[in-house]
From Swiss-Prot:
Its cofactor is Zn(2+). The gene is ileS. InterPro entries: aa-tRNA-synth_I_CS, aa-tRNA-synth_Ia, Anticodon_Ile_BEm, Ile-tRNA-ligase, Ile-tRNA-ligase_type1, Ile-tRNA_ligase, M/V/L/I-tRNA-synth_anticd-bd, Rossmann-like_a/b/a_fold. This is Isoleucine--tRNA ligase. The lineage of its organism: Bacteria, Pseudomonadati, Pseudomonadota, Gammaproteobacteria, Oceanospirillales. IleRS has two distinct active sites: one for aminoacylation and one for editing. The misactivated valine is translocated from the active site to the editing site, which sterically excludes the correctly activated isoleucine. The single editing site contains two valyl binding pockets, one specific for each substrate (Val-AMP or Val-tRNA(Ile)). It catalyses: tRNA(Ile) + L-isoleucine + ATP = L-isoleucyl-tRNA(Ile) + AMP + diphosphate. GO terms for molecular function: aminoacyl-tRNA deacylase activity; ATP binding; isoleucine-tRNA ligase activity; tRNA binding; zinc ion binding. It is found in: Cytoplasm. GO terms for biological process: isoleucyl-tRNA aminoacylation. Monomer.
């Protein structure tokens, strides 16, 4: 038996079958860093139309989690897809560096500022700590394959950025939006500071629920306000509260002017008494009390009760009944205990009625001496003392526990209180900021589109923004206030600029260490220097001004902001408000949001559940490209499900892409595009078709990338690999690739097609599978640039014109016939009739149209169907042994070839064994030997 293997063109490539990504990716990263790839991309794209994706800064504390990975990968996919689409798309990563979590960490290390260490030392340690956290996070982001200016990120603690944050505050003040007020704000007793809406998250909490009696000072006068009064027993107004700690600050009871109120006779264990409740609430309240024996003995309307004076349940304090539109009948009794210190509605209705605040709770949540018997107690631990006071005065009607959603600090995860304090606010109404922001939302493109409704909903409920914090590590509110008038210094714009210039040199210490006399001279004694710091949401919210405006490679407004869906209430909103306040226009043209990551069971990831999936671990085992492919393959507009099992499936789909690329490159063995490329007009028809398919797909992918439909990109690429290439084209060309002469048109045409496709393919996957794409790029034949990321969409894909006899519709019909025939072949194989399709002779019984189509391929139809012999006959000649297929107008008969197999091409042909020189070969293979005439192909 002769060895004909040397006469075959066997595939060969240095591109390994196994990705081994966890080991191979770090070397690729080092190569990118050594060649300064990001700067090379900037140089290549300079002068193109820009696309600015502005990075929402993660907080500089702790290791990155899978949510961080999702966010950064989505951004990277967009930046890279814009670059390959012909844009100049710089990416400047950023970090949010000030605020409470870092203060807490530093306190654990060196103690509290002002006690254990000086404030200046404390700030220096905070800065140092933030830098260490940034470096750790940066390493992981880079390891994910995210390309950006990692050597020059923006940090909100950079001196220049801190100075520009102060300047932004000055602009907002100059435009009339900054006001000082005394209002209840969310207050963290752990942090000792105010919080803005964006820093609040709701968690379930069990609270003590109390119904409390407020007795009237003049019972007869109160009863006179009711009609047809009956019954007996003492009278009291009943309030319901889930915050017993606010009762010492109770100063009024609010009722709704238009609600009907009932006098209810009932025995709650102290004998008969008469309770005043909203009439609509009587049934539900009595049910809650577990009481069935009660009756309504009088009625009135809320407005009639205004002015009634009640006694505080356990303090010597007059409690007026006041009217408030905020009162509802959704829960409680319809009578609302009102503490202006501890609620926005309470504060507002109190102010309308001339009731101020009494400030019984200190910064740390402990009652002051003015709270009498509660002095020194913490608001979290006062329930028992309040209960004792109520019981002592027979004021407790009913006690229970309630499980409800309660505001918590998003950083410390501890419950918050409302507390009235003097604070700085960005007013939503003084200069029409809120209305302007609502109007601006309409001009922004929201992805998904429901983001617009969500943002509008957030704005509709948006109070004045409390931007002041009582912290040490933060950008200062660098203002001077007149001690008498409480007005800003008349030269505030000039003073802001003076301070900003100093901060550029010394950082925020410049303000905190500065004496007022240095700027104000003799006027210093008339002014007080504000010691508050800015909300960190202000820091990040003004980066459109403090960063985008300051970096030459960026431009305002940004084309895109992209963050998690929680940022409608966070960064998207703070950025919008500050941009409108400074410039009157939104800071972004488009806003894209992604969902949160959950485990395979749809549960939020948490250490307590043990379901946290570490991106670092995945990178060290499967590789970053697997995480990147998972992100692209997942619909980011909803919750993003991830688990080890899901990532294994992603790894399987990755292998399909890798193996497809490897097959194409292996079959480019010996191909030099400079000398071996076949012009389109001379290419085999099937090869022209696959290039046309790639050209059409490239357009579709470009559209999908531009619309941020990355799961569509993935689906289309996977489909191209499994259907167009793996399921058809690559199978068909194997014979031509392996068996025709090395330099034949038949082989070089297929190699030309493969070269065009893989050139395009490497660019298609580059935004998603960045490591793999550049690995492919380094393996491709021919002269090329240093990296795939320096390229744009491949321009060598030539579409079919539509005039060809073998155009798109022709190949569509051929492919349909092949799929239908393959099912019959597969059935024959599974029944044991044959082992391989090449051992089959096939007869196709076709209707006239299909017969005409398939006959155009002539003898080459057998190569398309990968069979040894194919006949095409009229459908009318089909016998009972012909199998009907899914394709109308086609029946198929398959039988085992009676001829001997050619040892070189494995086709079964009549002439095998009849040629003395090469008895084991078919005539075609004899012709394709190096000294033969060579086979001619036209179609397949």
């Amino acid at each position: 038996m002769s060895d004909y293997k040397p006469t075959l063109n066997l595939p060969d490539t240095d591109f390994p079958m196994r990705g081994d990504l966890a080991k191979r990716e770090p070397a690729m990263l080092k190569r990118w860093q050594d060649m300064d790839l990001y700067q090379k991309v900037r140089d290549v794209t300079k002068g193109r139309k820009s696309f600015i994706l502005h990075d929402g800064p993660p907080y500089a504390n702790g290791s990155i989690h899978i949510g961080h990975a999702v966010n950064k990968i989505l951004k990277d996919i967009i930046v890279k897809s814009k670059t390959v689409s012909g844009f100049d798309a710089p990416y400047i990563p950023g970090w949010d560096c000030h605020g409470l979590p870092i203060e807490h960490k530093v306190e654990q290390l060196i103690g509290k500022a002002g006690t254990k260490v000086s404030y200046k030392e404390f700030r220096a340690k905070c800065r140092e700590y933030a830098y260490t956290q940034i470096e750790e996070q940066k390493k992981d982001f880079i390891r994910l394959g995210v390309m950006g200016d990692w050597e020059n990120p923006y940090l909100t603690m950079n001196f220049q950025t801190e100075a520009n944050i102060v300047r932004a505050l000055g602009k907002i003040a100059e435009n009339g939006h900054l006001v000082k007020g005394f209002k209840p704000v969310y207050w963290s007793v752990v942090g000792g500071s105010a919080l803005a809406e964006a820093e609040v998250e709701y968690q379930d909490k069990t609270s003590l629920s109390l119904d409390v009696r407020y007795a009237p000072q003049d019972e007869a006068a109160l009863l006179a306000k009711f009609s047809a009064v009956e019954g007996e027993g003492k009278v009291s107004v009943v309030i319901w509260t889930t915050t017993p700690w606010t009762l010492p600050a109770s100063q009024a009871v609010s009722i709704h002017p238009e609600f009907n109120y009932a006098l209810v006779e009932v025995d709650m264990g102290l004998g008969k008494e008469r309770l005043i409740l909203a009439e609509d609430m009587v049934a539900s309240v009595m049910s809650r009390y577990g009481v069935t024996d009660f009756r309504i003995v009088g009625r009135t309307v809320g407005a009639e009760l205004a002015g009634t004076v009640l006694n505080h349940p356990f303090l010597q304090r007059d409690i007026p009944v006041i009217l408030g539109e905020h009162v509802t009948t959704e829960a409680g009794t319809g009578c609302v205990h009102t503490a202006p210190d501890h609620g926005v509605d309470d504060f507002n209705v109190g102010r309308e009625n001339g009731i101020g605040t009494i400030n019984l709770v200190q910064d740390n949540g402990v009652y002051s001496d003015a709270a009498g018997e509660f002095a020194g107690l913490h608001v979290y631990k006062v329930d028992d003392a309040v209960l004792e006071a109520l019981n002592r005065n027979n004021a407790l009607v009913f006690e229970s526990k309630i499980f409800h959603s309660y505001p918590h600090c998003w950083r410390t995860k501890t419950p918050l209180i409302f507390r009235a304090t003097p604070q700085w606010f960005i007013s939503m109404t003084k200069e029409g900021l809120l209305d302007s922001a609502k109007h601006a939302v309409e001009g922004v493109k929201w992805v998904p589109s429901w983001g617009q409704n969500r943002m509008e909903g957030m704005l509709n409920n948006s109070p004045d923004w409390c931007v002041s914090r009582q912290r040490t590590w933060g950008v200062p509110i660098a203002l001077f206030i007149n001690k008498e008038t409480q007005e800003l210094h008349p030269e505030t714009p000039r003073l802001i600029e003076e301070v900003a210039k100093r901060i550029e040199v010394e950082g925020i210490d410049a303000w905190f260490e500065m004496e007022a006399e240095e700027l104000l001279g003799a006027d210093a004694e008339k002014y007080s220097k504000v010691t508050d710091t800015l909300d960190v949401w202000f820091d990040s919210g003004v980066t459109h001004y403090s960063v985008i405006d300051q970096r030459d490679e960026l431009s305002f407004p940004a084309d895109l902001y992209l963050e998690g869906s929680d940022q409608h209430r966070g960064w998207f909103q703070s950025s919008l408000k500050t941009s409108i306040a400074i410039r009157g226009v939104p800071p972004y043209k488009q806003v894209l949001t992604h969902g949160f990551t959950v485990d395979g069971d749809g549960r939020k990831m948490s250490k307590s559940l043990g379901n946290v999936l570490s991106p670092q671990k995945v990178m060290d085992t499967l590789g970053a490209d697997i995480i990147r492919l998972w992100v692209a393959a997942t619909d980011y507009t909803t919750e993003m499900t991830v688990s080890d099992e899901i990532l294994k499936r992603v790894a399987d789909s990755y292998r399909r892409i890798r193996n497809t690329a490897r097959f194409m490159m292996a079959n480019l063995n010996g191909f030099n595009p400079a000398t071996d490329m076949v012009p389109a007009k001379d290419m085999i028809a099937l090869d022209r078709w696959i290039v046309d398919r790639a050209a059409l797909l490239q357009k579709e992918l470009n559209t999908a990338y531009n619309e941020y439909q990355f799961h569509t990109v993935n689906q289309k690429i996977q489909n191209f690999c499994s259907v167009d290439l793996g399921g058809f084209y690559l199978d068909v060309i194997k014979d031509r690739q392996y068996t025709t002469q090395k330099d034949s048109l038949a082989r070089r045409s297929a190699q030309t097609a493969l070269y065009h496709v893989i050139e395009a393919f490497s660019r298609w996957i580059a935004p998603i599978l960045s490591f793999t794409a550049d690995e492919i790029w380094q393996t491709l034949p021919g002269e090329r640039g240093e990296s795939v990321f320096l390229e744009t969409w491949y321009e060598g894909l030539e579409e079919l014109t539509g005039d060809e006899a073998m155009g798109r519709e022709f190949w569509k019909q051929v492919l349909e016939a092949k799929v239908a025939t393959n099912k019959v072949l597969e059935a024959a194989r599974s029944e044991g009739k044959m082992k391989a399709s090449l051992s089959a002779d096939i007869t196709l019984y076709c209707d006239d149209a299909l017969q005409t189509t398939l006959n155009r391929l002539g003898e080459e139809l057998r190569f398309v169907l990968i069979a040894s012999d194919v006949k095409v006959l009229p459908l009318s000649q089909a016998g009972e042994d012909a199998v009907a297929t899914d394709l109308d107008g086609l029946k198929v008969h398959v039988e085992l070839s009676k001829y001997t197999k050619c040892v070189r091409c494995w086709h079964h042909r009549e002439e095998v064994g009849k040629r003395d020189a090469h008895p084991e070969l078919c005539d075609r293979c004899i012709s394709n030997l190096p000294d033969g005439e060579g086979e001619q192909r036209l179609y397949a």
